[in-house]
């Protein structure tokens, strides 16, 4: 996402020796990445995992017979499979369980309305059922939650902190995150449960609450749904469940946890191999020797793998990381390391796909253009094989749109022009890079993507527009001070203040946060609504947006990747579970 600094507006020629990098260097030496070795991918571990899957399936069948009409047990099973990251092994069992629950689902009452003693249990079951059914694209209305309010319009809650009530409030909080635009009751539920759960964590009278439940509460508040990606959630919940002695008394739960650990480590081994290929690709390129560019190939691999981790999407992941790495190089070039005239020539070279146009530019820009062409053409050839047709014209047009948006930002900064908020956002959505980044990845997911379906998941589709908007809003709301210090006059916050002189910077920041909250709800709707787009494509786009929320949670994790981002990489990609 471009940050055009003051030196972009200089008319003097820049040369390689005069360039200073303001970013920290590569944290992941190729020797270290190539040294990653683990026996967890050995055949005996795969065999043990396969055996556990069959054992658990048999236990599920037996348990579902024993519990008869116990809906909440079915919902708990679905939830734990998903939280531990092993749900892909039990798709049939999950479908059967949710179909059963949906048959008993009452749009007015949810799952049961009983006496005061059973109300908390029913409230918990209804909230758990609502969340699971909505995420699996069943038609359920949030109006069902209105039944769990008292005469004052507040959700039922006792004055004492009891474990079953904390569990209920946690379940309601998690359900409230899967909201659509205009669902007032969901906003009320989120506000109410956030306040309640925060008080639980900060209170002193929680001796009756299991420590594992408190760990779940802490995780839910720190990593809400839109920044809790599958691999991150799986690692966290494996650790939480492993400390829950009462939960582990069940034979089935022991098997489930063993499988979750095995599965995590087996996948991590596969991800090591992909990371090693990516690191070799980077270290052997000429661009890697240009030390003023950011080197974030490992960080970008983490971005994609935390959401799209399944073995069958290996090609997609590697392509995503390569394109994201290339985009960062271009970002740095347009941001800091090129004059306006050089950038115009570079952009024209991309439009014509012609290396000769940059012959008179400094060597580092020629190396950059070669890296751009080589990477793009390599992946265009991969796309042609996967999609069984030539997509080069479509891809080149998408690159053109992206770099024209960067050039527009460079021209604004050269003229010291602050555009209107609408002008900035329209261009900023394009310069977010999501259009080109997602395009290669979607085309390399291993399934044919006809033009009519591509239009529903890529530009100009609504879900793609929302992913682009998320990227722009996340970047601008978190990076404002950094951009300002770097000399960028045009940011979402500055443009909003210019349009609304009565607003403070804090008001403008809150406006962007409000837009982001609405975008999240619209993304939820686009994700769960039924259409002709295969779910794997929607999941990919959805998780790319969610990944940004995690990576930008504390700061721009790509720009400053030596803090939380480094910890994330060790947790997901380096350190196995024991």
From Swiss-Prot:
GO terms for biological process: diterpenoid biosynthetic process; green leaf volatile biosynthetic process; sesquiterpenoid biosynthetic process. Pathway: Sesquiterpene biosynthesis; Terpene metabolism; oleoresin biosynthesis. A motif (DDXXD motif) lies at residues 331-335. Pfam families: Terpene_synth, Terpene_synth_C. Its cofactor is Mg(2+); Mn(2+). Mg(2+) 2 binds at residues 331, 335. Binds 3 Mg(2+) or Mn(2+) ions per subunit. Keywords: Lyase, Magnesium, Metal-binding. InterPro entries: Isoprenoid_synthase_dom_sf (IPR008949), Terpene_cyclase-like_1_C (IPR034741), Terpene_cyclase_plant_C1 (IPR044814), Terpene_synth_N (IPR001906), Terpene_synth_N_sf (IPR036965), Terpene_synthase-like (IPR050148), Terpene_synthase_metal-bd (IPR005630), Terpenoid_cyclase/PrenylTrfase (IPR008930). It catalyses: (2E,6E)-farnesyl diphosphate = longifolene + diphosphate. GO terms for molecular function: lyase activity; magnesium ion binding; terpene synthase activity. Its EC number is 4.2.3.58. Mg(2+) 1 binds at residues 331, 335. Terpene synthase (TPS) involved in the biosynthesis of sesquiterpene natural products included in conifer oleoresin secretions and volatile emissions; these compounds contribute to biotic and abiotic stress defense against herbivores and pathogens. Catalyzes the conversion of (2E,6E)-farnesyl diphosphate (FPP) to longifolene. The Asp-Asp-Xaa-Xaa-Asp/Glu (DDXXD/E) motif is important for the catalytic activity, presumably through binding to Mg(2+). This is Longifolene synthase. It comes from Picea engelmannii x Picea glauca (Hybrid white spruce). The gene is TPS-Lonf.
């Amino acid at each position: 996402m471009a940050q055009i600094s003051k030196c972009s507006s200089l008319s003097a020629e820049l040369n390689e020796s005069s360039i200073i990098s303001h970013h920290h260097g590569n944290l992941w030496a190729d020797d270290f990445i190539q040294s990653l070795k683990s026996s967890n991918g050995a055949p005996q571990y795969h065999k043990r995992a396969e055996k556990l899957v069959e054992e658990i399936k048999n236990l599920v069948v037996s348990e579902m017979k024993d519990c008869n009409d116990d809906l909440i047990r079915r919902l708990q099973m679905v939830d734990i499979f998903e939280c531990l990251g092993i749900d892909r092994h039990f798709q049939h069992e999950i479908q059967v369980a949710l179909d059963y629950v949906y048959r008993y689902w009452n749009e007015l009452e949810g799952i049961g309305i009983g006496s005061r003693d059973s109300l908390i249990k029913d409230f918990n079951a209804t909230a758990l059922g609502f969340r699971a059914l909505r995420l699996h694209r069943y038609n359920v209305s949030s109006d069902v939650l209105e039944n769990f309010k008292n005469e004052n319009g507040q959700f039922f809650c006792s004055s004492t902190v009891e474990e079953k009530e904390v569990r209920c409030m946690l379940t309601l909080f998690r359900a409230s995150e899967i909201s659509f635009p205009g669902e007032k009751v969901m906003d009320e539920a989120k506000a109410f449960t956030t306040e309640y759960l925060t008080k639980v964590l900060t209170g002193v009278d929680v001796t009756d609450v299991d420590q594992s439940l408190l760990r779940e509460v802490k995780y839910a508040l720190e990593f809400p749904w839109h920044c809790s990606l599958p691999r991150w959630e799986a690692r966290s919940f494996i650790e939480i469940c492993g400390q829950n002695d009462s939960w582990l008394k069940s034979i089935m739960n022991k098997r489930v946890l063993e499988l979750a650990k095995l599965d995590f480590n087996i996948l991590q081994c596969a991800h090591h191999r992909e990371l090693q290929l990516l690191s070799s690709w980077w270290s052997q390129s000429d661009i890697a020797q240009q030390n003023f560019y950011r080197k974030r190939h490992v960080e970008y691999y983490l971005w994609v793998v935390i959401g799209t981790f399944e073995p069958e999407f290996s090609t997609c992941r590697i392509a995503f990381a390569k394109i994201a790495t290339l985009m960062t190089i271009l970002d740095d070039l347009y941001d800091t390391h090129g004059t306006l005239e050089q950038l115009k020539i570079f952009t024209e070279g991309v439009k014509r796909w012609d290396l000769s146009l940059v012959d008179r530019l400094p060597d580092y820009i020629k190396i950059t253009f070669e890296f751009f062409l080589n990477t793009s053409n390599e992946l265009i050839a991969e796309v042609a094989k996967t999609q069984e047709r030539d997509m080069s014209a479509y891809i080149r047009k998408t690159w053109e749109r992206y770099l024209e948006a960067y050039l527009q930002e460079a021209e604004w900064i050269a003229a010291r022009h602050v555009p209107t908020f609408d002008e900035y956002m329209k261009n900023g959505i394009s310069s977010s890079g999501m259009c080109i980044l997602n395009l290669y990845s979607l085309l390399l997911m291993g399934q044919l993507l006809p033009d009519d379906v591509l239009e529903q998941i890529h530009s100009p589709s609504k879900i793609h527009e929302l992913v682009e908007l998320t990227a722009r809003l996340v970047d601008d709301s978190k990076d404002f001070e950094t951009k300002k210090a770097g000399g960028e006059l045009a940011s979402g916050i500055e443009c909003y203040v210019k349009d609304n002189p009565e607003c403070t910077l804090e008001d403008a920041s809150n406006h962007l946060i409000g837009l982001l909250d609405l975008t999240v709800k619209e993304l939820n709707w686009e994700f769960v609504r039924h259409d002709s787009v295969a779910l794997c494509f929607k999941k990919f786009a959805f998780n790319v947006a969610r990944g940004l929320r995690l990576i930008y949670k504390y700061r721009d994790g790509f720009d400053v990747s030596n803090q939380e981002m480094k910890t994330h990489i060790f947790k997901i990609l380096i350190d196995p579970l024991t």
